[in-house]
Amino acid sequence: MKKIIGYHINKSGIYTSKGESCLESPFLDFLLQPEPDTIKVFYHMEYSISNLLILIGVTREEAEKLQHKNYLHLDAYTLKYIPGKYFSIAKGHYYKCPFVNFSDVNQYSSAKLENVTSKEACLAAALNAQETGEEVYKTLTGLGLNPTSLTSPIKVYEKEVLDKIDLPTIDDIPEDAGFYAYQTCQGNWVETFQIGHWETAYDYDINSAYPSELAKLVDIRLGKWKESKQWIPEAKYGYCKGIVTITEPYSPITYNVKGSGFNNLNYTPVGEWETFLTKEQIEFIYKWKLGKFELINGWWWIPEKESKLLEDEVTKLYLQKEQSKGLSKKIIKRTASGIWGKFLQVQKDGFGDKFNPVYGAEVETAVKLRVSDFVLRNRINPISIAVDGVISPKVVNDLGNENEIGRWKLTDTASCISVGTATVAMKGKEKNADFSLSYKWLMEEIKRDPKATEYSMKKMSPVTLAVALNGNWEKLGELREITKTVYIGNNVKRQYKKTPEYGEDLLNNYYKSEPWDITVISNPVEEPDH
């Protein structure tokens, strides 16, 4: 059992959850003090490191190296820094030299920095970091893990669980099949279909959507791959290049637009375009009569035997999540979803060691199709879709056992205000993330100024190393006010015949959308080099 020590640093010095402080040099030696069986955490890493660099007199040139190369040699010391994730100090260049590393608990519970200036407030921040770290540590050990840092839940889970499972990777997939599969990965689906205000709306989501699909994945080494321009119905997985034609106004088939103008966004247009789709996506198009697909070429995986490699571990995580609450539940959920992320992980030096575009594609597209099936089957005109959830203006009955993994559940019934894509809020459902839209805040702003065309949220944010090096070096470590603006009637992902002009219009009208025609937003598909 390890103990947790919290740290907070400002321009006056270093403060710890043990009630200690260091207000003069040598600051690095203070941080290096040996603490056996201890995990050290920052209340807000980027803020603390910015101020530590000021305390130890780092020059701009040295800071540039730390930011861009992630390490810096200072006399006998070596600093390593990945912003918001990891920081370490080593003293000396020999085996078992003094060494310490830190994690950032701000990723688990958003830190408030506005009033953390006095000694008492700094010590309280350090204690808060310790308490958050203890909850994270308790959650991970409850999963049977033995973390030595709190940098990433999925990292320790990967080391102690995933690495012990013999999983197929990109090396087990024909190169072109892997390329086809990767092209079907378009990212999470977030889209708003209606704008306005509803006195009653219903928030549905899939219970552990990504884990439920992870549990279904089978070992692709127990079968054979076949390239064919013909449809192969017995294939379990298929990745097809072809011409899709979408004729219906609601469809889960996305088109990614890169660059300016329409921005880098996923759209769900109507029309005809060349693309890559999974076998399941094509079957979905025909099941719901959304259009058609003209097959040019495909890669197909035909099973000889089916073995579900992740089912047991995913089920364990799910049961643990259902028995948890608060931060612990969020950490377990994040860990389970992080498994999918490993299958699509791309690093600076190439693919991650578990990179598997087949698994990544199957999970991602399956969730989109589950959401679309729910919408179409229940004849919902959705207000919005956010990855694995649907906000609906109508109630859906007969959901079955909502507590089972992969089943639909009603998570909230409340008033809802929708401004545009990713700008939707349910009353009473406040989120901790920075600049998350609050129903209460927006309603108050509209009532205060009903004729406004935009509303701005403000918060204090640290001048981090990256920000300071971008023309604000003298302000390193200070707090600055940043703003996020909610614009009324400025939604480009779908087209509206009429849009709200002022805030008050949102409260008095409903605005329905239609998909763009592909000819308005299209750009060419890039072919691989062979």
Residue ranges of model-derived segments:
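Two-metal-ion RNase H-like nuclease active-site motif
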Residues: 1-10, 201-204
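Conserved acidic
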Residues: 16-530
